[in-house]
Amino acid sequence: MPTPSKPLAGLKVIELGTLIAGPFASRICAEFGAEVIKVESPDGGDPLRKWRKLYEGTSLWWFVQARNKQSLTLNLKHPEGRDVLKRLLADADILIENFRPGVLEKLGLGWDVLHALNPRLVMVRLSGFGQTGPMKDQPG
């Protein structure tokens, strides 16, 4: 009997997330069949890689949150890294990010830029206290 298609098969998700919220959201997408590409910084990647190290320095948390994903290292502080990200986003369906509010805008990657690049892109922004309001800059 053929395996039924997963509900998110055919969707491309780009994850700009660290620790829990962003990686958890994209992991669910991956489990439901989406292609997920996790973008990590060159300064050690997602800190989750180092949480509760087990055998040979690996992290159970990392293995749980990173499964079924591809991973790519990009330095978004450099134009070349931002250009590669833009190429990935040009045909992506979903962007999941959990930076503090304003980080993507400071990098020149705010919603206005990304929407002009790919009008059908869905952007999921996860932060501890939302994107606006008096507590927006508080860590989550």
Kindly label every feature range from the protein language model.
Residues M1-G140:
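N-terminal helix-loop segment corresponding to the beta1-alpha1 unit
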